[in-house]
UniProtKB/Swiss-Prot annotation:
Record-linked InterPro entries: RNA_methyltr_RlmE, RNA_MeTrfase_FtsJ_dom, rRNA-MeTfrase_E, SAM-dependent_MTases_sf
UniProt subcellular location: Cytoplasm
Role: Specifically methylates the uridine in position 2552 of 23S rRNA at the 2'-O position of the ribose in the fully assembled 50S ribosomal subunit.
Residues that, per the record, bind S-adenosyl-L-methionine: G67, W69, D87, D103, D128
Organism: Acinetobacter baumannii (strain ATCC 17978 / DSM 105126 / CIP 53.77 / LMG 1025 / NCDC KC755 / 5377)
Highest classification ranks of the organism: Bacteria, Pseudomonadati, Pseudomonadota, Gammaproteobacteria, Moraxellales
Protein name: Ribosomal RNA large subunit methyltransferase E
Pfam families: FtsJ (PF01728)
Catalytic residue list: K168
Molecular function as annotated in GO: rRNA (uridine-2'-O-)-methyltransferase activity
Domain of life: Bacteria
Family: Belongs to the class I-like SAM-binding methyltransferase superfamily. RNA methyltransferase RlmE family.
Keywords: Cytoplasm, Methyltransferase, rRNA processing, S-adenosyl-L-methionine, Transferase
Length: 216
């Protein structure tokens, strides 16, 4: 049986977060326009600025649940494209999106992904992954950078020539070192801070374009 959450059962910080969330214009907009999360508008702004995803492309979305980025990618690639959404968490089905549940680091999951690709070249890897935060920045920051490194390693394995990469990164310890890894792997690096990113958030999005022939 569902339990009703009352203000009395929430901490002061949780109540503040809930008020901010419910009042967030991007949350309201996502609900109105049918997106699964406000994060959709981050990718939409990046797409509007850089025109990364095009009809017929093959896209892999890491840490895809609940699926807002995959929603956008599926619409952009169209019927001739392919979007593979991967997450260790379950995700409700989406039209024009193939969902693969599991840890993409595991050989069995990676092999399933290759089977889905069936020889297709991956044009872009997108990642909005973030760890479950503890509130301790000394713990959360390295965890998030680690996820970024996993996403980059995956991209290096699957991207075709001139492939592209979009990844969410928290600014802080390890950011500069990770940024250099992306610089070493792509011809062009751009940094985006979409309007849908909350002002207090340390997140930015690194956009790598033109996968280098010899990845570092």
């Amino acid at each position: 049986m569902a339990t009703r959450i009352t203000n009395q059962k929430l901490s002061k910080s949780s109540r503040a977060w809930m008020r901010e969330h419910l009042d967030d214009p991007f949350v309201k907009k996502a609900q109105k326009e049918g997106y699964r999360a406000r994060a959709a508008y981050k990718l939409l702004e990046i797409q509007e600025k850089y025109k990364l995803i095009k009809p017929g492309m093959t896209v892999v979305d890491l840490g895809a649940a609940p699926g807002s980025w995959s929603q956008i990618a599926g619409k952009l690639v169209g019927s001739k494209g392919l979007v593979i959404a991967s997450d260790i968490l379950p995700m409700d089905a989406l039209p024009d999106v193939t969902f693969l549940q599991g840890d993409f680091r595991e050989e069995a999951v990676f092999e399933k992904l290759l089977n889905i690709l069936n020889g297709r070249q991956v044009d872009i890897v997108i990642s909005d992954m973030a760890p479950n935060t503890s509130g301790n920045r000394a713990v959360d920051q390295p965890r998030q950078i680690y996820l970024c490194e996993l996403a980059l390693d995956f991209a290096q394995k699957v991207l075709g020539p001139n492939g592209q990469f979009v990844v969410k990164v928290f600014q802080g310890a390890g950011f500069d070192e990770f940024r250099k890894q992306v610089v070493d792997s792509f011809d062009v690096l751009k940094t985006a801070k979409p309007a849908a990113s909350r002002a207090r958030s340390k997140e930015v999005f690194l956009v790598g374009q033109g996968r280098k022939k010899a990845l570092q």
